[in-house]
Amino acid sequence: MASISSLNQIPCKTLQITSQYSKPTSKISTLPISSTNFPSKTELHRSISVKEFTNPKPKFTAQATNYDKEDEWGPEVEQIRPGGVAVVEEEPPKEPSEIELLKKQLADSLYGTNRGLSASSETRAEIVELITQLESKNPNPAPTEALTLLNGKWILAYTSFSGLFPLLSRGNLPLVRVEEISQTIDSESFTVQNSVVFAGPLATTSISTNAKFEVRSPKRVQIKFEEGIIGTPQLTDSIVLPENVEFLGQKIDLSPFKGLITSVQDTASSVAKSISSQPPIKFPITNNNAQSWLLTTYLDDELRISRGDAGSVFVLIKEGSPLLKP
């Protein structure tokens, strides 16, 4: 049936043949006989033959496919033109939006600033300008109504809060650095945990505060700190010291200590396992002044900009975001 269906789709023209002899009429033609030319049988046959060979026949291809047995006519046959090539048009790459470009520029400007501590005045001005532009294009103008976006761990990438600068400057102490400052938010329990991780050649430890927050406006939350936590030092069983450290502008050679470190390597390994198994130290925060408010001025799924007391600004990036990669 597929062949019949295909044949029915071939266009055909009906050839009308005028008979050489016309039926007699009651009226006599006024035209002279010499002015009327009737084609002969030979000319008529020649005309038919020429048209038959000069008009090319359409080509078609029938392809057998599985079809429903209930369909008595079978599937429709797709006509394929000779020499046709199927071309799949690929969509052009999506151009980044203005917000994405601004976020990328901001991340590039933050690189090497040590969370703002080492930023020059020119870099600070550039960062402030980019922050202002992003705040004007905030995709979530009421962040407290989109609390699920606040969920998760946020890494501090930049701040102008001078109260954190003494903490950040501890990274300049020999063998000690601030590895990470983060804020973890749980919108279901309305809790916030601020954490600072310190790292050294012998161990890593953390200091955290747990707090509750309340929504006060579409952009503002009130935070009350309730508990402090000193994490158990996680000692490393493989101690690696640098060749030298810089302290107060002078380089101190640490090579004499390498022999001592090697001799106590096995002891440190056993101590690390015993200390790391101890629970962290927790203490309540009873000071009534241990509270603050936070205003979120920009929020999406990977970037958050907040402003705190005295106009200080915080730029935080969601853990796992490509913006954290230099």
From Swiss-Prot:
Which species is this record about? Solanum tuberosum (Potato)
TM helices/strands, residue ranges? none
InterPro entries to which the protein is assigned, alphabetical: PAP, PAP/fibrillin_dom
Q: Extract the PANTHER family matched here.
A: PLASTID-LIPID-ASSOCIATED PROTEIN 4, CHLOROPLASTIC-RELATED (PTHR31906)
Q: In which tissues is it expressed?
A: Expressed in leaves.
Record's subunit section: Associates with the major light-harvesting antenna complex polypeptides of the PSII oxygen-evolving complex.
Against Pfam families, the record matches this protein to: PAP_fibrillin
Alphabetically list the UniProt keywords: Chloroplast, Membrane, Plastid, Thylakoid, Transit peptide
Biological process annotations from GO: response to water deprivation
State the source organism's domain of life.
Eukaryota
What is the protein named? Light-induced protein, chloroplastic
Main role?
Required for normal plant growth. May be both photoprotective and play an ancillary role in photosynthesis. May structurally stabilize thylakoids during osmotic and oxidative stress.
Kindly indicate whether the keyword Cytoplasm belongs to this entry.
Answer: no
User: What is the induction comment?
Assistant: By high illumination, water stress and abscisic acid.
Q: Which family does it belong to?
A: Belongs to the LIPC family.
Predominant cellular place of this UniProt entry's protein: plastid
Localization recorded for this chain is: Plastid, Chloroplast thylakoid membrane
Q: Where is the transit peptide?
A: 1-63
What cellular component GO annotations does this protein have?
A: chloroplast thylakoid membrane
